[in-house]
Amino acid sequence: MKTENTRIPLISIKNLSRSYPDSKRKLFDKFNLELNKGDFLVVTGKSWSGKSTLVKFLIGQLKAPKKTLFYKLEDMADFSDAEIQRYRRKIGSMFQDYELIHTMTPQENIIYPLLLEEVPLTTIKTKYEAVKEIIDLSSIQTSDIKRLSGGEKQKVSIARALIHAPDFIIADEPTGNLDNESTMQIAEILIRANKLGNTIVLVTHDTALLEFLRKNANIKMLELIN
């Protein structure tokens, strides 16, 4: 018996148009995008090209018009506030400023989302050990967050994004505050995570990082031009 091999995209954007605030100038004009499981999508573009706005749509911070933004074929314009919150819990996010809790150790920061969801401690331990297979945390997991370097803080941020096995990870300019060596370390972690099946959306304007990813990862490029 013949079966159809249908792939449901995680995210679909169809003919999305949006103008700059207080302007008729188009930020997006009939914009289309499809994000599938296992993708490593790299989004680039100059300032004011729409990168930040795209991230806001993807994390559910901005509401798109009906029939333009879909999560697993469901129109997100129809999502209630509670459904948006559930959707956000299925996303891992990491940003340039890390967003870590300074009164917690790195390990506590990483497992905190699971504690909020009342995940059993045995499951938390298993998930934490799985993350450590991707990121070497042995030298920093009980350290004082305030004493960590930028690269070490970003490792904690990635681990926290990965630990609840999200549908996809949004990394918005994650290397913006890092030196070249730390940037390459973060890139290698993202590549390892993607090779293990994690879906990545990386927003960056770092040319050295882009060149490294082109040579070492199977990426899809999206350049926003405005």
Feature annotation, model-predicted:
Residues 59:
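Helix-to-loop junction immediately C-terminal to a conserved catalytic motif
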